[in-house]
Amino acid sequence: MSAKIIDGKQVAQTIRNQVAAQVQQRLAQGKRAPGLAVILVGVDPASQVYVGSKRRACEEVGFISRSYDLSATASQEELLALIDRLNDDADVDGILVQLPLPAHCDTTQVLERIRPDKDVDGFHPYNVGRLAQRIPALRPCTPKGIMTLIETTGVKTHGLHAVVVGASNIVGRPMTLELLLAGCTTTTCHRFTQDLEQQVRRADLLVVAVGKPNFIPGEWVKPGALVIDVGINRLADGSLVGDVEFETARNHASFITPVPGGVGPMTVASLMENTLSACQDYHDQAL
């Protein structure tokens, strides 16, 4: 059996088209376009690529995009002051601080400074807590995008045994919460997990987010499993691979995301959805 490939690019394009149509509808009603402020500290090449893709997506859907590029030596006080100004700006619906930050910045303090109703990345403890309480508001973008991809397969998640490999605050932990909300029996594996192979082999739904190339051997994948590969790793020859050994895994799985072109585009598409939601759900009423 060969798995069906879940085309994240296509699904993400559909979402962007839907968001763009809603923006045009807003403008036709005399309402303003949603606004997203993107803050980049320093000149990390990978971060610049990610920020560029987010800015292009804003242009495509018709958002007002604002860019704030601070030097790597900018103080935490400068960054917090900028966030405070954007929190008070009625034309800004979403504030995104590109991670990672320079070592002298306290990431937790910076993310907590963003107003929860403008936290379109979904990283604020308030929004993660809402998800844990089963009343999600602005949901973390990558897990949100993954749930959208799973929905497109038609696979019913209730009762599935889901395994998440990786426990980061950005993907692994909120992904576990999303899968619990979707009715899965969910196991989270991390650096201290003793029996990783056995856990992976039991997974009806496998999500891997560790940032290590081909970390999960394809033969570990349970026959018929749905595999979501969040990792994107560049090898010495310049090629991109995920955290799962793709060619072997696709012969076991029923559905699998490719790398690139799987989860990555969905993260940005979910950011567009969150920004529109923040505008409509929280800020329109303030006008």
From Swiss-Prot:
SUPFAM superfamilies per UniProt: Aminoacid dehydrogenase-like, N-terminal domain (SSF53223), NAD(P)-binding Rossmann-fold domains (SSF51735)
Identify the pathway: One-carbon metabolism; tetrahydrofolate interconversion
Q: Which UniProt keywords apply?
A: Amino-acid biosynthesis, Histidine biosynthesis, Hydrolase, Methionine biosynthesis, Multifunctional enzyme, NADP, One-carbon metabolism, Oxidoreductase, Purine biosynthesis
Question: Can you name one GO molecular function term for this protein?
Answer: methylenetetrahydrofolate dehydrogenase (NADP+) activity
Judging by the UniProt lineage, the source's domain of life is Bacteria
Could you identify this protein by its name? Answer: Bifunctional protein FolD
| Alphabetical GO biological process terms | L-histidine biosynthetic process; methionine biosynthetic process; purine nucleotide biosynthetic process; tetrahydrofolate interconversion
Catalytic function, reaction form: (6R)-5,10-methylene-5,6,7,8-tetrahydrofolate + NADP(+) = (6R)-5,10-methenyltetrahydrofolate + NADPH; (6R)-5,10-methenyltetrahydrofolate + H2O = (6R)-10-formyltetrahydrofolate + H(+)
Q: Which HAMAP family match?
A: THF_DHG_CYH (MF_01576)
Answer yes or no on keyword Transmembrane.
no
What residue stretch is flagged as signal peptide?
Answer: none
Identify one Pfam family in the record: THF_DHG_CYH
Listed binding positions for NADP(+) are: 166-168, 232
- Report the function annotation for this chain: Catalyzes the oxidation of 5,10-methylenetetrahydrofolate to 5,10-methenyltetrahydrofolate and then the hydrolysis of 5,10-methenyltetrahydrofolate to 10-formyltetrahydrofolate.
Assembly, in brief, is:
Homodimer.
One cellular component (GO) term of this entry:
cytosol
Assigned EC number = 1.5.1.5, 3.5.4.9
What family is this protein classified in?
Belongs to the tetrahydrofolate dehydrogenase/cyclohydrolase family.
